[in-house]
């Protein structure tokens, strides 16, 4: 078996778990705001944390919550048809993660950002929420990553 491919898959799986936990943490943060450090402590013992890329989880949560969300919501509003405050909290969390990755993580290909966001929205969001997430992240990727397309 190709060792580098296996290692890349394992790293990708660990990041996917980190994103899942970040969606849950950011959902909690929206419902009951508090310091991002509390989110890290709260989720440190999560059942899936041993399978997650803990550093990536922290980068997502800290990168979004540390700014208080207002800056991210202002940026997100450029790509949505309604105010971010009116979004379902799950889709809002997924979109914040996607926007963070598109803006600050050029090491993550835009297609991965969109695929992961759609998958999380399918798993945790409303019935057709994944379609909305797909459209918004696609719009954001066109503007934020024009050279990748």
Language-model features, listed with the residues they occupy:
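N-terminal interaction/assembly modules
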Residues: 1-149
């Amino acid at each position: 078996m190709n060792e580098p491919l296996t290692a890349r898959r394992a790293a990708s799986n660990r990041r996917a778990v980190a994103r899942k936990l970040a969606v849950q943490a950011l959902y909690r943060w929206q419902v009951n705001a508090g310091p991002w450090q509390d989110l890290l402590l709260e989720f440190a013992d999560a059942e899936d944390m041993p399978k997650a890329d803990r550093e990536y989880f922290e980068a997502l949560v800290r990168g979004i919550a540390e700014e208080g969300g207002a800056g991210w919501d202002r940026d997100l509003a450029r790509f949505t048809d309604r105010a971010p405050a009116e979004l379902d909290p799950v889709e809002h969390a997924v979109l914040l993660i996607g926007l963070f990755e598109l803006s600050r993580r050029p090491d993550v290909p835009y297609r991965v950002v969109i695929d992961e966001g759609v998958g999380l929205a399918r798993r945790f969001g409303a019935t057709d929420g994944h379609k909305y997430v797909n459209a918004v992240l696609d719009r954001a990727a066109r503007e934020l990553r024009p050279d990748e397309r």
